[in-house]
Amino acid sequence: MTQADNQNPKPMVLIILDGFGESDETTHNAIKEANTPTLDKLFRHYPHTLLEASGRAVGLPDGQMGNSEVGHLHIGGGRKVPQDLTRIDAAIASGEFYENPALIEALEKAKALNKAVHILGLLSPGGVHSRDNQIAALVELAHHCGIKKIYLHAILDGRDTPPKSALLSIEKITDQFHAYGNGKIASLIGRYYAMDRDKRWDRTEKAYDLLTQGTAQFHALTAKEGLMLAYEQGNTDEFVSPTSIHRHNETPITIEDGDVVVFMNFRADRARQLTYAFLDDHFTAFNRQVRPKLSAFVTLTAYAKDIHAAVAFPPLELHNTLGEYLSARGYRQLRIAETEKYAHVTYFLNGGQEAPFNGEDRLLIPSPKVATYDLQPEMSAVEMTNKLVEIIQNDDYDLIVCNFANPDMVGHTGDETATREAIQVIDDCLKRIITALQSVGGEALITADHGNAEKMFDEKTNQPHTAHTSNLVPLIYVGREAQFCKEVGALDDVAPTLLYLMGLEKPREMTGRNLITLK
């Protein structure tokens, strides 16, 4: 399709409704059940289409649900990007995993010093932050390397998986340890504590103290017993309190001087805080009573440039992402989101680029400090909208990218009523943003990174559905008269479509396609 050759509206606003999927099912669909006059009007009167946001369309295995990291990477990248989950699984299948230099070097250090190897990771089949088969592969590698003490500190999911589903993963890895005879699960803790990303350092501290001092609310003889104890306390997997697994006459297993740690989460954002607690020489977020001097600390993927650890699978470099391409042409752009999704509209949208590009400003709106977001389903959407409306009216930017976290973050709680309220808040915010845009002659593309809020209950497990979905997501254009092509697109088509509407050809690195024609 040819480049749009008329005067291009300004600003163009890309609105990402995080966790907003499309489903014809109306029961337990918080989006369909919500009162959404603005969205109803958009779908009735403006051009719209659907996009694939899961599986191969976003560089994941067939059937694998999408997630925010992958979604933003494809929205900003404009191309299919092989994801870490796929890369690592392929390395396991080919045998390359078992020859990985970073892993082998760390394991050899532990063997030479007769020290323990501690595996940290989300023990889950979810495939969003980790996958349990990859943890099993590392246990296998450590066994074949002759490591005598292999300890798994299992972080439990219940968010990208059903709320009470950890037992199967625990039993599988326990059977593997029994077969090898040289390892065990040493501790359990819910991801609520170990994988915080919102600087709630009191949660991270509980995980760190469990790992380094054995400080635990509960003690159990086996991991299964520890999990059942958590369930008896009314906790689901995500919220399992720090639990040490050991015999009554033994001391807890902790990470000690000379030991090796391998963090097996492949997604960076929720692994950073705990990693900083181990590695940051200038760490001040809480008082570390113990800081073990480790022989090695390996991260499965790169978590951040200022985290100095060996990396088993370094990132693929992306060039000419949406942000970089616009920056090189002198366009001014703004990224705005609340804390929970700030990394996604900056780091991930920019293809893993930490620093802003020239002409790129960033605005962080703090997320509310509540235990879970069903307690405040509006989160910080109204505050962000207030800022956004003001910025639109000032006419300082060519492109504004914003993310509304509510459908995803409230959807993850499994609270259908709260999620419905969250959708209604977003609907009100969209009305204000579109009104402001139309008053200055601006335009909007509205999309999502993956599904979530459209499925709030799982009939198969008879539990609340707290995970993402593999459903399609919308793409709505609010602007000039236009028509979308008939074929379903994918998230990597968003950037080429956006560039077309801004009157720009896409760069050759972008393999996604423009989905719209201006009339």
UniProtKB/Swiss-Prot annotation:
Keywords: Glycolysis, Isomerase, Manganese, Metal-binding. PANTHER family: 2,3-BISPHOSPHOGLYCERATE-INDEPENDENT PHOSPHOGLYCERATE MUTASE. Binds 2 manganese ions per subunit. Mn(2+) 1 binds at residues 408, 412, 468. Coiled coil: none annotated. Catalyzes the interconversion of 2-phosphoglycerate and 3-phosphoglycerate. It is an enzyme of class 5 (isomerase). This is 2,3-bisphosphoglycerate-independent phosphoglycerate mutase. Monomer. Its EC number is 5.4.2.12. Disulfide bonds: none annotated. Gene3D superfamilies: Alkaline Phosphatase, subunit A, BPG-independent phosphoglycerate mutase, domain B. NCBIfam families: pgm_bpd_ind. It catalyses: (2R)-2-phosphoglycerate = (2R)-3-phosphoglycerate. One of its GO terms (molecular function) is phosphoglycerate mutase activity. InterPro entries: Alkaline_phosphatase_core_sf (IPR017850), BPG-indep_PGM_N (IPR011258), Metalloenzyme (IPR006124), PGAM_B_sf (IPR036646), Pgm_bpd_ind (IPR005995). The keyword Manganese applies. GO terms for cellular component: cytosol. Belongs to the BPG-independent phosphoglycerate mutase family.
